From Swiss-Prot:
It comes from Nitratidesulfovibrio vulgaris (strain DSM 19637 / Miyazaki F) (Desulfovibrio vulgaris). Disulfide bonds: none annotated. One of its GO terms (cellular component) is cytoplasm. Residues 281-305 have a biased composition (Basic and acidic residues). The modification N5-methylglutamine is found at residue 232. This is Peptide chain release factor 1. Transmembrane segments: none annotated. The gene is prfA. Methylated by PrmC. Methylation increases the termination efficiency of RF1. It is found in: Cytoplasm. InterPro entries: PCRF, Pep_chain_release_fac_I, Pep_chain_release_fac_I_sf, Prokaryotic/Mito_RF, RF-1. Residues 281-309 are annotated as: Disordered. The lineage of its organism: Bacteria, Pseudomonadati, Thermodesulfobacteriota, Desulfovibrionia, Desulfovibrionales. GO terms for molecular function: translation release factor activity, codon specific. Coiled coil: none annotated.
């Protein structure tokens, strides 16, 4: 591990020298690539340098343990104990930083939320989930754009699809795929009985042209009139678009825009991301056919989390985590929840790496 870290530090220093060159600065394409490579290495190099500094301080303190002055020996002993306890933590941090990066982590994300069992209450819960992710995105400084929405009669969502754009969106949201269950008393419930309903969430990395090739011969495009809640026509022209990808059977519809061209562009964006996710799932299943991911498969049918409003708790069943801060989570303050999922995934990756070695 440490030989690899030394190589990374040398690479980092080489990049710093190149970035200081006027020749590189004048070549903006090269400058951008080197800047990104430099940024990718900075965290691990900074931690490695801190680790080496701790090691050096520990060696210096151990020399003072033989000092003639008992007070200096005592101080050196206490300092050495403190340094020895800090070093294993830094070593684990370095191990985590050296784990292979998910190439999709940097991507923007398409979030698909669909009401499940529970009728109108499920549609209202789907809207609550969309608001939670939107508020979280706002807190993170990300941008949310609705690509498609099918509203229910009570103001919920039968389905809503949105694009979230920002820094490392997929890395933070990728564990959200699955079935989310809610337990609460609906506003229409006169007896005060708790109802259970559900919504499914799918998290897809936004596909770029280089990621997915969609051949024109592989798709069928149908146009139709857009309709709103209750089935009433909201557009007299055939602006809504339905795209069918015939090889995979994936169907995407979009009717939010008045322009057929804009609806087609949005539907193509969703289709490309679904195809990319399908390919990633296929590769994942091939590589991990003999073991199931401990954070969950991301299968939409998998119940991953329960939101219990009477008790004010949210429970993630994959990692046995319960937080009694449901109100804050629903307002987008979900950092602790997402951090716990990310940490668990990293821990499992370290275990898997140790098993291979």
């Amino acid at each position: 591990m440490f030989a690899k870290l030394e190589n990374l530090e040398r690479r980092f220093e080489d990049l710093e020298q190149q970035l200081a060159s006027s020749e590189v600065f004048n070549d903006q394409d090269r400058y951008r690539k080197l800047t990104k490579a430099h940024a990718d290495l900075k965290e691990v190099v900074d931690v490695f340098r801190r680790y080496k500094e701790l090691r050096q301080n520990l060696a210096d303190n151990k020399e003072l343990l033989d000092d003639a002055d008992p007070e200096i020996r005592s101080m050196a002993h206490e300092e050495a104990k403190s340094l020895e306890s800090a070093i294993p933590e830094i070593e684990q941090e370095l191990q985590l930083l050296l784990l292979p990066k998910d190439p999709l982590d940097e991507k923007n994300t398409i979030v698909e939320i669909r009401a499940g069992t529970g009728g109108e209450e499920a549609a209202l819960f789907a809207a609550d989930l969309f608001r939670m992710y939107s508020r979280y995105a706002e807190i993170r400084g990300w941008k949310v754009e609705i690509l498609s929405a099918n509203e229910s009669d009570t103001g919920g969502y039968k389905e809503v699809i949105a694009l979230i754009v920002g820094d490392k969106v997929y890395s933070r949201l990728k564990f959200e795929s699955g079935t989310h269950r809610v337990q609460r008393v609906p506003a229409t419930e006169s007896q005060g009985r708790i109802h259970t309903s559900a919504a499914t969430v799918a998290i897809l990395p936004e596909a770029e042209e280089v990621d997915v090739e969609i051949r024109p011969d592989d798709i069928r495009i149908d146009v139709f009139r857009a309709s709103g809640a209750g089935g009433q026509h909201v557009n007299k022209t055939e602006s809504a678009v339905r795209i069918t990808h015939m090889p995979s059977g994936i169907v995407v519809s979009c009717q939010d825009e008045k322009s057929q061209h804009k609806n087609k562009a949005k539907a193509m964006k969703v289709l490309a991301s679904r195809l990319l996710q399908a390919e990633q799932d296929r590769q994942h299943n091939e590589m991990a056919a003999d073991r199931r991911s401990q954070v969950g498969s991301g299968d939409r049918s998998e119940r991953i989390r329960t939101y219990n409003f009477p008790q004010g708790r949210v429970t993630d069943h994959r990692i046995n985590l319960t937080l009694y801060s449901l109100d804050r989570v629903m307002e987008g303050e979900a950092q602790a929840l997402f951090d716990a999922l990310s940490t668990h995934a990293q821990t499992e990756a370290l275990k898997a790496q140790a098993d291979v070695q």
